[in-house]
Amino acid sequence: MARRFLLEFEKPLVELENQIDQIRELARDSEVDVSQQLLQLETLAARRREEIFNALTPAQKIQVARHPQRPSTLDYIQMFCDDWVELHGDRNGTDDQALIGGLARIGEKSVLLIGQQKGRDTKENVARNFGMAKPGGYRKALRLMDHADRFNLPIISFIDTPGAYAGLIAEEQGQGEAIAVNLREMFRLKVPIIATVIGEGGSGGALGIGVADRLLMFEHSVYTVASPEACASILWRDAGKAPEAASALKITGPDLMKLGIVDEVLKEPSGGNNWAPLQAGDTLKNALEKHLSELLALSPDELRNNRYSKFRKMGKYLESQSIESEISV
């Protein structure tokens, strides 16, 4: 069993985790019954873990969303999808490995799946470009979404990216245009679209596959117009102010629910999805099936009109009481 990667704020759990590992080794190597001690330590660790994760700051949630062992797009596909067939290429000479897509079944329903894919180690991350898609990736996604629209297949997208790739080659190939075309065309699609932020949802890279009838996100996922590090560098010329930027950006599920951007926040296991990936998979599958059932009852015109209205309502703001008082005077 691979050792869990602990984040900085999880370090108080290290001693307990070490004790649990030692007792498990003792149980394997001898006939001594240590089940009671093991149960007590595991219960204590679970309680402390829950206390820590119930009090996470936005900056700490970003660390959880970026956790190297957090389930990825392909992990969820393997957990609850049948007959997965990956489709390749944008038909313009590229096949971006940072953004994948293909056909599968969820339960009895055939769907098109698209999503960003990060790597587990340095070699795989380089191959996947750390989940940052280039223009060819977004054009591949659009080609597959057009295919789904033609054959009346619901579209399920998994968002997990720090942002679209911002290198020189991406700009030369039309990164902004590729994302903009996706935004325009996703509003025109006649099939249900459900997007889920499974980890990090960063900037236009997330929005390029995120124009959906329903937007879901996990409890410790984040969805933001810019990374807190980038925001802090722009506003204060100091990336060290990223925690303050994270709080100001309103990137967490509860904040985004209040703003009317997210439709449902999915509960995570104690310690995050990386602690119990199968449980996370069950949660996501149940949510997708529920929302898919509701959306399939709508006509194509209703889907498109509701989708357009949903995004037109975004961007509301509230004035403070003092400002309202000044205006009334």
Swiss-Prot record:
Gene Ontology molecular function: any one: ATP binding
Keyword Secreted appears in the UniProt entry: no
Catalytic activity field: N(6)-carboxybiotinyl-L-lysyl-[protein] + acetyl-CoA = N(6)-biotinyl-L-lysyl-[protein] + malonyl-CoA
Top enzyme class: transferase
Subcellular location: Cytoplasm
InterPro entries: Acetyl_CoA_COase_a_su (IPR001095), ClpP/crotonase-like_dom_sf (IPR029045), COA_CT_C (IPR011763)
E.C. code: 2.1.3.15
Cysteines engaged in disulfide bonds, as pairs: none
Protein's pathway: Lipid metabolism; malonyl-CoA biosynthesis; malonyl-CoA from acetyl-CoA: step 1/1
One GO cellular component term: acetyl-CoA carboxylase complex
Residue ranges constituting the CoA carboxyltransferase C-terminal domain according to the UniProt record: 40-294
Keywords, comma-separated and alphabetical: ATP-binding, Cytoplasm, Fatty acid biosynthesis, Fatty acid metabolism, Lipid biosynthesis, Lipid metabolism, Nucleotide-binding, Transferase
GO BP: fatty acid biosynthetic process; malonyl-CoA biosynthetic process
Domain of life: Bacteria
Subunit note: Acetyl-CoA carboxylase is a heterohexamer composed of biotin carboxyl carrier protein (AccB), biotin carboxylase (AccC) and two subunits each of ACCase subunit alpha (AccA) and ACCase subunit beta (AccD).
PANTHER family the UniProt entry points to: ACETYL-COENZYME A CARBOXYLASE CARBOXYL TRANSFERASE SUBUNIT ALPHA, ACETYL-COENZYME A CARBOXYLASE CARBOXYL TRANSFERASE SUBUNIT ALPHA, CHLOROPLASTIC
Similarity field: Belongs to the AccA family.
HAMAP family noted in UniProt: AcetylCoA_CT_alpha (MF_00823)
Reported function: Component of the acetyl coenzyme A carboxylase (ACC) complex. First, biotin carboxylase catalyzes the carboxylation of biotin on its carrier protein (BCCP) and then the CO(2) group is transferred by the carboxyltransferase to acetyl-CoA to form malonyl-CoA.
The name this protein goes by in its record: Acetyl-coenzyme A carboxylase carboxyl transferase subunit alpha
Native source organism of the sequence: Prochlorococcus marinus (strain NATL2A)
Gene: accA
